[in-house]
């Protein structure tokens, strides 16, 4: 009996230690490096879109690091409102220039920037998903302190990590509403879901607990922001958009959770894109082409790196960036309702 108990305790301790090591590895691998995009990919700029103007802007975030981006606008356009955009994990805001241009052409100014540790902004590393909330709040304060934006309604817009940031910045002064596409509940949850959760779902809670601890050690009492709790606290209008085939921010464990609680809420509009994955603002064909393209390149890298590099040069960007007009129209109409005070 005693021996059996010792075996059980030892086995349990070994599992806990293994999950701790995994959580520490995941935390460091994701958060402790910069994200400058893929040097072989083309990231669109304002020059790629007729009539789109980009004015450089910069501002300071929480630790004095400079964040850089652009104010996107059309010449001689009286803007309906200012849209403040938070990008997703990885490449910086220029991975979304096509979508930003669509919003500008609909009559908005768009303030978009690169988060700490990403692309053109300062920071030796990403620090963590909670850092994005600090950065977005800094962007909002920058906009609130600029005389040129006085009297303009301000709308938050974000995708993935950016949507998480948006949902946790709703109560900043001057924000009239928000659009959140494919946002996750918390940083610790989404990391554990995408690592141990894929192979040993029963241990997801344990890795999440360790990740929460690491985030607390890094960000203090404001660590571990929770999008569900933040959305419960606001009365501002919010549009939630999810693809029900999303496996990056697992739909059943994130989007479906939001929709079960908030669909029908007076201030929340929900849109589920059937058959869409993590980029619901794209057409299904564009999502499929993107996945096939990058899967083929990844497979080729294992065989012949130089041939994989050559494949980047043959990417059909028009095909993989084709927007879903209905989704983008929904976003713009929602922003229109906010700018009109409806």
Go through each PLM region and give its residues.
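An N-terminal hydrophobic leader/cap segment in hydrolases
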Residues: 3-60, 70, 295-310
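The serine-hydrolase catalytic nucleophile loop
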Residues: 89-102, 115, 252
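Conserved alpha/beta-hydrolase
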Residues: 100-122
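Alpha/beta-hydrolase active-site loop
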Residues: 126-147
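Hydrolase active-site cap/lid region
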Residues: 168-220
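Short beta-strand/loop motif that positions the catalytic acidic residue
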Residues: 234-235, 240-246
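Short alpha-helix in the alpha/beta-hydrolase fold that links the catalytic acid
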Residues: 236, 250-261, 285
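Catalytic active-site module of serine/aspartate enzymes centered on a nucleophile-bearing elbow/loop
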Residues: 284-342
């Amino acid at each position: 009996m005693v021996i059996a108990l010792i075996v059980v305790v030892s086995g349990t301790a070994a599992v806990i230690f293994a999950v701790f090591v995994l959580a520490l590895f995941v935390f460091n691998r994701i958060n402790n490096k910069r994200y400058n995009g893929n040097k072989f990919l083309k990231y669109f700029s304002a020059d790629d879109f007729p009539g789109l103007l980009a004015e450089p802007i910069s501002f300071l975030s929480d630790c004095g690091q400079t964040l850089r981006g652009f104010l996107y606008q059309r010449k001689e356009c009286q803007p309906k409102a200012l849209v403040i955009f938070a990008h997703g994990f990885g490449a910086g805001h220029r991975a979304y220039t096509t979508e930003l241009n669509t919003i500008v052409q609909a009559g908005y100014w768009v303030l978009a920037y690169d988060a700490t540790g990403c692309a053109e902004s300062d920071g030796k590393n990403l620090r963590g998903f909670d850092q994005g909330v600090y950065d977005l709040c800094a962007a909002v304060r920058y906009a609130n302190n600029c005389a040129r934006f006085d009297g303009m309604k301000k709308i938050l817009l974000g995708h993935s990590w950016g949507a998480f940031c948006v949902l946790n910045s709703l109560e900043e002064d001057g924000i009239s509403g928000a659009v959140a596409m494919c946002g996750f509940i918390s940083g610790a949850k989404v990391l554990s879901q995408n690592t141990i959760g894929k192979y040993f779902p029963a241990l997801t809670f344990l890795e999440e607990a360790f990740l929460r601890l690491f985030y607390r050690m890094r960000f203090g009492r404001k660590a571990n922001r929770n999008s569900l709790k933040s959305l419960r606290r606001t009365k501002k209008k919010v549009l939630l958009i999810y693809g029900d085939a999303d496996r990056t921010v697992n739909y059943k464990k994130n989007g479906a959770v939001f929709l079960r609680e908030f669909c029908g809420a007076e201030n929340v509009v929900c849109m589920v894109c059937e058959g869409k994955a993590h980029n619901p603002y794209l057409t299904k064909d564009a999502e499929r082409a993107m996945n096939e393209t990058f899967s083929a390149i990844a497979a080729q890298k294992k065989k012949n790196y130089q041939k994989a590099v050559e494949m980047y040069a043959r990417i059909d960007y028009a095909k993989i960036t084709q927007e879903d007009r209905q989704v983008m129209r929904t976003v713009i109409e929602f922003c229109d309702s906010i700018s009109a005070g409806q």
